[in-house]
C-alpha cells in the first residue's frame, strides 16, 4: 500500500494531479479542498494517499491532511458510497463541516452537495454518526475554525491580502458555513 508521496507537482487538472516522484508520475484524484490548497505546478509537495485496487484498475487518492484521508475512508465504508462520491462530499464540505453536519443531523447541508440525494444523505447521517468526531478529534467548535480557515484561504487565493481577509473575517458570524462566509466576506470587501 502507498501511504504517502513526496515529489514535484507536475500537473494540476481538477480533480486530478500528477505528482512526479523521482521520475515516476503518479496520477492522483484529490478533493477540491486539497486541490485549491496545493502549491503551483513545479513546486514540491507531500500528500497522504489512499490506494484502491478495483477490477477496472488501480487508483490513488491524495489528501493534504490525515483528517481528510480518514474522513474519505469512513465515507467509503458507507453503503452505496464510492470513491467519486466520497471525493464530492469532501469537495463540498470541509472535514469539520462534515463532522458538524453529521453530529447535528443536518440533512440539508449534505443534500446541497452535487451527487448527494435525500436517501444518500440520510444514509450518510446514519452510518457516520459518531465515527468522524470521535476518531478525528473534531468537535463542533473546531468545525467553525475549519470553516473560517477555508474562508480565509479562499480570500487569499482570490488576491486579497491578509489584513483585508482578517478584517472581513471579524465581521462574520461565528457559526457561518464556508460557502456563506465566502459570499458574505466578498460582499464586505467589495464595499471597501
UniProtKB/Swiss-Prot annotation:
GO terms for biological process: DNA recombination; DNA repair. GO terms for molecular function: ATP binding; four-way junction DNA binding; four-way junction helicase activity. InterPro entries: DNA_helicase_Holl-junc_RuvA_I, Hlx-hairpin-Hlx_DNA-bd_motif, NA-bd_OB-fold, RuvA, RuvA_2-like, RuvA_C, RuvA_C_sf. It is found in: Cytoplasm. This is Holliday junction branch migration complex subunit RuvA. Residues 144-149 are annotated as: Flexible linker. Signal peptide: none annotated. One of its GO terms (cellular component) is Holliday junction resolvase complex. The keyword Cytoplasm applies. Homotetramer. Forms an RuvA(8)-RuvB(12)-Holliday junction (HJ) complex. HJ DNA is sandwiched between 2 RuvA tetramers; dsDNA enters through RuvA and exits via RuvB. An RuvB hexamer assembles on each DNA strand where it exits the tetramer. Each RuvB hexamer is contacted by two RuvA subunits (via domain III) on 2 adjacent RuvB subunits; this complex drives branch migration. In the full resolvosome a probable DNA-RuvA(4)-RuvB(12)-RuvC(2) complex forms which resolves the HJ. The gene is ruvA. Keywords: Cytoplasm, DNA damage, DNA recombination, DNA repair, DNA-binding. The keyword Cytoplasm applies.
